[in-house]
């Protein structure tokens, strides 16, 4: 992604909508658990991840679709929050290379169960019903935000995780 776009500088935002408070992480953001946690801490009730992911031009035999779904499901379970992950389908043909996008958009409930999933080959609209009150209650009971050890996390701010 950094080869095609300039990184944003607005931080991670949460928006109030008529349905829920939503946090949106786009494309490459989806691979960083810190992004999901920040949006959840800011009050997001649903995480949205619009993306365009598929085969890697350098290794077109590698299918990362299961790994992609597991990463998003992990964000859902770790933050006890529903996730909506949308992905494009089809092939993008460039002058020198092409890239296949594998679809498989999905929705999870707040414990990481997939409640809706699209296929790889055709456009689909997914609908899923989630219970935001149950999600909030579970977060309060489990205390995953309350019990964090923030005094031990400063190493996350260093690229190599070093203590110095």
Regions found by a protein language model. Give the residues of each.
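Short, P/G- and charge-enriched loop/turn segments at secondary-structure junctions
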Residues: 1-2, 11, 115
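A short, polar/charged loop-to-alpha-helix boundary motif
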Residues: 1-6, 122-140
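Short solvent-exposed loop/turn micro-motifs enriched in small/polar/acidic residues
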Residues: 5-8, 98-100
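Cysteine/selenocysteine-centered motifs that mediate thiol-based redox chemistry or coordinate metal-sulfur cofactors
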Residues: 6-45, 135-164
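Active-site beta-strand termini and strand-to-loop segments that position acidic
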Residues: 15-18, 109-110, 130
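CN hydrolase (nitrilase-like) catalytic-core segments centered on the catalytic cysteine
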Residues: 21, 27-125
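A sequence-level detector of short, solvent-exposed, charge-rich linear segments
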Residues: 58, 91, 95, 130-134, ...
